[in-house]
Amino acid sequence: LGQLGFYINQSLCTGCKACSVSCKDKNNLDVGINFRRVYTYENGSFMEQPGGGIVHNIKAFYYSISCNHCTNPKCLPSCPVGAIFKDKDNGVVTIDQEICQGTQLCVKACPYGAPQYNKKVFKSNKCNLCIDLQEKGEDPVCVATCPMRAIEFGPIDELRKKYGNVSQIKGMPSDTITNPNLVITPHKDARLSSS
């Protein structure tokens, strides 16, 4: 298969959070722990008209993000006990719950906020691209539940060939930090980052 990754069509995302809720449900995550998050981006301004009144050019759009299973994951070398692994076949980055000691250094190292710390079990965990579902021939739960079909997954080379190479938009960390395995079709009103 090669390196797996996500494709996000930001122009289709309505911010409904079905992806986030289904991920939370599948992984039985406590309040405050989200392996997939949906952010709202807003831009524009209000302008006063010379004769009175106000007009606006306010735009809002949404972005769904989880672990990007980066080529150069900052979480991996940050773990002092070696609990984080990048699969050599599919590139999926996972945290071994048997080894994790909850130092939270991975949480601090990831520019995307992917690892989430669970205070109840004193361990960090994150998206594993629903490897268990993939082994049964199913899509990751976030992909399967998106009513707008704004999320896809697959070999990143194929996704890039099909959708291009945009992996950073306004409000996101520089894609040069970790080389995320992510492709984005930006919303028409999104201002692309200058990377």
Predicted regions and their residues:
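Non-ligating segments of multi-cofactor redox enzymes
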Residues: L1-S195
